[in-house]
């Protein structure tokens, strides 16, 4: 109800489809596949449990009207040498402290990292060496959640492939939906890049074995890395 005592009309959360461009980037861009990562001061380029620097798959600025996380910068990393489904480590539905570093069986540590940063400044001096840099564009749309259709998008509500999943952060807050990636998108890589294990092609990478990916994050922002990739399909 507004200040005049009238009932306000409910509006669905804003959402944006993510479109991947075709012209390779030759300079930093905040919305990109691969490219030059934008990281907060003191935030190092994430590393896998194996010690290798993780590959930047994509990054983007979330529009200001995205629920909970508007205006923040989303970055998705995964090790080029390790490719598997994510495995939420939780007791009941509550994730363990620093769940983003927890072992991911059969691995002794984490091979992925997703960051939500408030306002990272200048980009890294060197670009992501493996994933080919391409621009991303966001356009407002409405996801009808039709059968057999899943969009690469931020905001709105998750279009679960199988069934809704929910988790609580170690801090106690229920994780909120940020982004979804459809099944088996291919991220082209540069010549000479390491071949991804269990990949689709030698010249492309996939996220989490090509599963559909749903990114859920802590709305209290207890840590920039408090983002969980949930896999289905």
Give the ranges of each region predicted by the language model.
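Preference for intrinsically disordered or flexible, low-complexity segments
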Residues: 1-233
């Amino acid at each position: 109800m507004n200040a005049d005592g009238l009932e306000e009309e409910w509006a669905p959360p804003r959402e944006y489809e993510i479109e991947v461009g075709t012209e390779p980037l030759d300079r930093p861009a905040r919305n990109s596949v691969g490219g030059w990562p934008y990281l907060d001061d003191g935030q190092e380029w994430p590393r896998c449990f194996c010690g290798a620097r993780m590959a930047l798959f994509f990054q983007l600025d979330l529009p200001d009207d995205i629920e909970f996380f508007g205006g923040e910068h989303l970055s998705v990393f995964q090790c080029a040498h390790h490719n598997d489904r994510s495995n939420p480590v939780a007791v009941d539905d509550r994730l363990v402290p620093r769940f983003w570093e927890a072992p991911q069986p059969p691995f002794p540590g984490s091979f992925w990292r997703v960051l939500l940063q408030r306002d990272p400044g200048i980009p890294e001096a060197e670009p992501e060496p493996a994933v080919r840099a391409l621009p991303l564009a966001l356009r407002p749309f409405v996801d009808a959640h039709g059968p057999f259709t899943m969009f690469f998008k931020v905001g709105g509500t998750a279009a679960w492939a199988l069934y809704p999943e929910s988790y609580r952060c170690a801090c106690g807050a229920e994780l909120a939906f940020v982004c979804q990636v459809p099944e088996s998108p291919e991220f082209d890589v540069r010549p000479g890049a390491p071949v991804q294990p269990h990949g689709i092609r030698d010249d492309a990478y996939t996220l989490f074995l090509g599963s559909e990916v749903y990114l859920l994050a802590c709305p209290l922002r207890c840590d920039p890395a408090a983002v969980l990739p949930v896999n289905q399909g």
